[in-house]
Amino acid sequence: MSLNLNDKKAVVAEISAKVATAQTIVVAEYRGIQVGHLTQLRAKARDQGVYLRVLKNTLARRAVEGTAFADLASEMTGPLIYSISDDAVAAAKVISDFAKTNDKLVVKAGNYAGKTLDKAAVTALANIPSREVLLAQVLGMMLVPVASFTRGLAALAAKKAEGETPAAAAEPVAEVTEAAAE
């Protein structure tokens, strides 16, 4: 079905709005993919907050014109599905994960931070943990010293409660008394 000029302008405006806030765009060829599989891909993309759409390449080129994603225009040939995301890795992750299980979906290229990515770079980007996972890992690393310190204080308090003086604390006192005697 062909779109009239007003419909084309509306599509370009919609995609331009998505691209304006996006961090990543990934394009993949979907030649021969079954409708049921494409529906599953769309559901996964929706769950991850990724905008996924099959577009006419000319309309997509016009939407990215003048943006950081303009370099991707040279890769926009053939039947493509466009994956656009505000999250840096979500678009690459959705497309790459689906391409692992469905050989008819072939990652073609991507663009992140104004740089065009080839298939290998998109796959590498997809293997990076999501923002939430990275934040959880950083928080975990920040809490390790605090947890170790509190365990040490708890052990010290337990020894004092038993009436024992910790060996480490007793040695410096002995050294001070020897130094005072000389």
Swiss-Prot record:
**What InterPro entries does the annotation carry?**
Ribosomal_uL10, Ribosomal_uL10-like_sf, Ribosomal_uL10_bac, Ribosomal_uL10_bac_type, Ribosomal_uL10_CS_bac
- Name a GO CC annotation attached to this entry: large ribosomal subunit
Claim: Transmembrane helix is one of the keywords in the record: no
Entry keyword set: Ribonucleoprotein, Ribosomal protein, RNA-binding, rRNA-binding
The GO terms describing molecular function are: large ribosomal subunit rRNA binding; structural constituent of ribosome
Q: Which GO terms describe its biological process?
A: translation
One Pfam family, short name: Ribosomal_L10
Keyword Lyase among UniProt keywords: no
Biological function: Forms part of the ribosomal stalk, playing a central role in the interaction of the ribosome with GTP-bound translation factors.
The entry describes its oligomerization and partners as: Part of the ribosomal stalk of the 50S ribosomal subunit. The N-terminus interacts with L11 and the large rRNA to form the base of the stalk. The C-terminus forms an elongated spine to which L12 dimers bind in a sequential fashion forming a multimeric L10(L12)X complex.
Protein family (similarity comment): Belongs to the universal ribosomal protein uL10 family.
Query: What is the protein's name according to its record?
Result: Large ribosomal subunit protein uL10
UniProt source species = Herminiimonas arsenicoxydans
Classification of source organism: Bacteria, Pseudomonadati, Pseudomonadota, Betaproteobacteria, Burkholderiales
Query: What gene makes this protein?
Result: rplJ
